[in-house]
Amino acid sequence: MIDKIQILDNNIIELAKTFHTEQNTKIAKFLTEFGGKKGVIAFTIITMIIILIYYMKKSKEKKLHKEEDVSMFKARITGYAVALSVPITLGIAVVTKTVIKMLVNRPRPNAFPEIMVETGKSFPSGHSIGIATMVTILIYFVIISDMNRVLKYILVTLLILFSIVIASTRLYMGVHYLSDVIAGLTLGYIIGT
């Protein structure tokens, strides 16, 4: 089974090479940053702000409806707690990724050094875990929001596609195998929930 996965992984890297152009490489290098440390930190901050705004709005709605001050206070405290859970969830993703990388100890392919060379271990993809975790948290807030259903479906679909595109850049650049990326996305979606 492992041999078949490795054969598929190698074939996907060869397939990725057929898409290499100067323009595609520029795009991939730009997009991959969304799954890197700076990108995930930015996503974390944006997500925390969205959460705080959402719960502050809920708190104001309670005030407009002349509900008890306790109810408004609960909405605000919930907002702060949920916002703080975002970096905690991301921390869990980072620890999980680090432990699995140490246990599996899979070398990176670094198949296209002219495009990018990464250090560290390959399995699972940290970019994939990071972006999938953040996207899953955002999806949750899209789902519970007051948006109409069609807009929710569109946003959820776009967020999932975005995470897949970011993960795919790691294949394009030859710094991860397909199985690394699939494992990273799967772990990120699970941890994000």
Q: How should these model regions be labeled?
A:
Residues 25-28, 33-36, 79-83, 148-155, ...:
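Membrane-interface helix-boundary signature
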Residues 49, 114-193:
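Membrane-embedded catalytic cores of phosphoryl/pyrophosphoryl-handling enzymes
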Residues 55, 59, 102, 167, ...:
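Transmembrane helix-loop junctions and nearby membrane-interface residues
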Residues 31, 79-81, 85, 89, ...:
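Small-residue packing motifs within transmembrane alpha-helices
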Residues 57-61, 65-149:
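Membrane-interface loops
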Residues 40-47, 86, 90, 155, ...:
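Hydrophobic alpha-helical transmembrane segments of polytopic
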Residues 35-56, 134-138, 142:
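Hydrophobic alpha-helical transmembrane segments
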Residues 1-43, 101-116:
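N-terminal transmembrane-helix/juxtamembrane module of multi-pass inner/ER membrane proteins
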